[in-house]
């Protein structure tokens, strides 16, 4: 099962990816974690990314797709993977699609975790308050969610056109949402 988890900040993507890793017995690939590990390992792509980040810029899609190509060549992904945090825009979705076609392993499904904005704001602002972070005010969270929605809406359409988008209600207990994902995937 080759799967992407999509959802706005606070939707529970990382939490559900960790749960699905156990349920489906396939690796969870977080692009953020992948980027950090490549930088720490000092790989050529990691060194490029480190230089870009040191200048305060965003890591290019070409570097990210290169890191993903390297990661997807490992033997632990033979039975599949769960990708979280990528793609974030249409250009990345097209690049991922091209990479997976080249590898002969297209995606089986893209799960969109759907959570109402008010619930997301409550989750993120509550988490920020618990962690003592003052930057995640309700207004700041709403702005982040709008940026996410603007960039990700075309990605959702991209996968919907391919017939692999599954919309799952992301509200509820961890086990309830996990069960909805398993049912949607037909596992």
UniProtKB/Swiss-Prot annotation:
- Determine if Calcium is one of this entry's keywords: no
Q: Where does AMP bind?
A: 31, 36, 57-59, 85-88, 92, 133, 144
* Keyword check for Kinase: yes
* PROSITE patterns on file: ADENYLATE_KINASE
Which GO terms fall under molecular function for this chain's record?
adenylate kinase activity; ATP binding
Q: In which pathway does it act?
A: Purine metabolism; AMP biosynthesis via salvage pathway; AMP from ADP: step 1/1
Q: Which UniProt keywords apply?
A: ATP-binding, Cytoplasm, Kinase, Nucleotide biosynthesis, Nucleotide-binding, Transferase
Q: What is its main location?
A: cytoplasm
| GO BP of this protein | AMP salvage
Renumbered to this chain, region (NMP) spans 30-59
Reactions performed catalytically: AMP + ATP = 2 ADP
Q: Where is the signal peptide?
A: none
Q: A Gene Ontology CC term for this entry?
A: cytoplasm
Enzyme type, top EC level: transferase
EC number(s) of the enzyme?
Answer: 2.7.4.3
> How does the annotation summarize its subunit structure?
Monomer.
Summary of the function given for this chain in its UniProt record: Catalyzes the reversible transfer of the terminal phosphate group between ATP and AMP. Plays an important role in cellular energy homeostasis and in adenine nucleotide metabolism.
Q: Domain description from the entry?
A: Consists of three domains, a large central CORE domain and two small peripheral domains, NMPbind and LID, which undergo movements during catalysis. The LID domain closes over the site of phosphoryl transfer upon ATP binding. Assembling and dissambling the active center during each catalytic cycle provides an effective means to prevent ATP hydrolysis.
User: What protein family is recorded?
Assistant: Belongs to the adenylate kinase family.
Name by which UniProt lists this protein: Adenylate kinase
């Amino acid at each position: 099962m080759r799967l992407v988890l999509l959802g706005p900040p606070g939707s529970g993507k990382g939490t559900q990816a960790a749960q699905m890793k156990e349920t489906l017995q396939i690796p969870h690939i977080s692009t953020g974690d992948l980027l950090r590990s490549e930088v720490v390992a000092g790989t050529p792509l990691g060194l490029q990314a480190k230089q870009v980040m040191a200048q305060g810029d965003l890591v290019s899609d070409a570097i990210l797709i290169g890191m993903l190509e390297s990661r997807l060549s490992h033997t632990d992904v033979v039975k599949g993977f769960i990708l979280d945090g990528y793609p974030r825009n249409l250009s990345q979705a097209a690049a991922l699609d091209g990479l997976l076609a080249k590898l002969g392993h297209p995606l089986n499904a893209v799960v969109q975790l759907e959570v109402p904005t008010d619930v997301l704001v409550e989750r993120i602002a509550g988490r920020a308050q618990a962690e003592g972070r003052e930057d995640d005010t309700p207004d700041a969270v709403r702005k982040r969610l709008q940026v996410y929605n603007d960039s990700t809406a075309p990605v959702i359409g991209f996968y919907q056109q391919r017939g692999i988008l599954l919309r799952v209600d992301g509200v509820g207990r961890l086990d309830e949402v996990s069960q909805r994902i398993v049912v949607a995937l037909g596992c």
